[in-house]
Amino acid sequence: WKWGLYATAIYESDNERFTASLGLRADANNYSSKMKNMLDQLSPRLSLSYRIAGDIYLNANAGRYYELPPYTVMGFKDNDGNYVNKGNALQYIRSDQAGLGLEYRPSSFLKFTAEGFYKHYNRYPMSVIDSIPLASKGTDYGVMGNEAVTSTATGRAYGM
């Protein structure tokens, strides 16, 4: 089983020039004791938008996100039928993210956006066999994650 809660609050200025959204999400499941407590997977999020001029907006966002490891990782068993990674203290993958960008809204149904982003990953599944994070392995049209892992890899991603 898995469960989660989400709440959000939105503020919009009277002149519709500024909008802020604050959210909080919590997730959990019964896979292991490391994943059962929703407080261990609290994900705060903040999004801001400010109309600079006319149809041009400056947008910014930041947040923490938790994601379940791949089901192939969670379901990997040894020859005796034991869930290997349950015993390896497998955890949710954590990602801290931030973004900043410009948006042009020429009409109510069309918008153009350019945004830069940065993501920092923590607790990513790392292969016990070869010490390579699963994100760096690729799939080559095969199955990824059918092996013993620990939640110890870190990483980052950034771009436009």
Feature map (PLM): residue ranges:
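Transmembrane beta-barrel strands of outer-membrane/channel proteins
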Residues: 22-28, 60-64, 114-118
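Short, solvent-exposed loop/turn and secondary-structure capping segments
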Residues: 33-34, 71
